[in-house]
Amino acid sequence: MKRWWILLGIAAMACLLSPFQGTDVGKLRPAQWVYLSRDGETVLVRTDLGDLGKGGGVGEALGDLMESAPGALFLDTADYILVSPECADLIPNMGGWVRGAAEVYVTAAPPDEETGAFLEAHRGKTLLRDCMLGTQALSGLTRDGERWILIDG
């Protein structure tokens, strides 16, 4: 019995004194929005952080995005999914990559650094989970010169 306590103590000391493997906070990359578009047959996925993924389908493009990001990219922090009109049929493929409570917008204009702030101030009604169930019309987002305009679905 005494021997087990000694072994347990040694194991506890080894755990406490061993080097910790943490993650450099500077390498954590939480995305605010994800933009889905096409270039011919190639699906493109871009984030507000400037990361880009390409592939033959959504899963392949998102996988490429995760691999090519210079750090730990978090898509489940994304509040918004922006989709070009030609990719609207791909929205259900975003499930499992982005949380179901993310708002979905169709936009012909590519997002920029002001898009996230605009969407924070003007909330849409369409969530990814609703799109996957087909229960909600898509909200639109358009650009008029320098300003964004929300078109609720």
Please tell me what each predicted stretch does.
Residues 1-153:
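Membrane-proximal alpha-helical signals and transmembrane carboxylates
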